[in-house]
């Protein structure tokens, strides 16, 4: 049987820390082509990962993380996901996430109308914060959070 005796490993990494580093039976993420589920002996993949959730299952245990955008790679039974932010669903504070969204939207409204390089970059960064906040709320409501 394919994969017999083999194990899939997953690493979920942010610039600050390694969020998850261990065995997995199934890793699910949203990449450029849509949602992907990876099990042992999966074919190699390199892609971007979108603001969504990453679900890591091992046995009866499932861990869910709200993530920002980043990169996704599968090779040799190792899934590597590199993102700016990854928060366990159980640790998400919905009120705090909603506050982050409101604050970022206020900042967007205060940006100058002209589109010079600095304001374009600021608009992109603030828009990313809004998307992350919205994703935190979505994941907390779907998978449990505070």
From Swiss-Prot:
Pfam families listed in its UniProt record: ATP-synt_DE_N
PANTHER family for this protein: ATP SYNTHASE DELTA/EPSILON CHAIN, ATP SYNTHASE EPSILON CHAIN, CHLOROPLASTIC
Keyword terms, alphabetized: ATP synthesis, Cell membrane, CF(1), Hydrogen ion transport, Ion transport, Membrane, Transport
Subunit relationships: F-type ATPases have 2 components, CF(1) - the catalytic core - and CF(0) - the membrane proton channel. CF(1) has five subunits: alpha(3), beta(3), gamma(1), delta(1), epsilon(1). CF(0) has three main subunits: a, b and c.
Family: Belongs to the ATPase epsilon chain family.
NCBIfam families recorded: ATP_synt_epsi
Taxonomic superkingdom: Bacteria
Function: Produces ATP from ADP in the presence of a proton gradient across the membrane.
Membrane topology: Peripheral membrane protein
Compartments reported by the entry: Cell membrane
Name recorded for this polypeptide: ATP synthase epsilon chain
Region (Disordered), start-end ranges: 103-124
One term under GO cellular component: plasma membrane
Keyword Membrane included in the entry's annotation: yes
Organism: Rubrobacter xylanophilus (strain DSM 9941 / JCM 11954 / NBRC 16129 / PRD-1)
GO molecular function (one): proton-transporting ATP synthase activity, rotational mechanism
UniProt keyword Ligase, yes or no: no
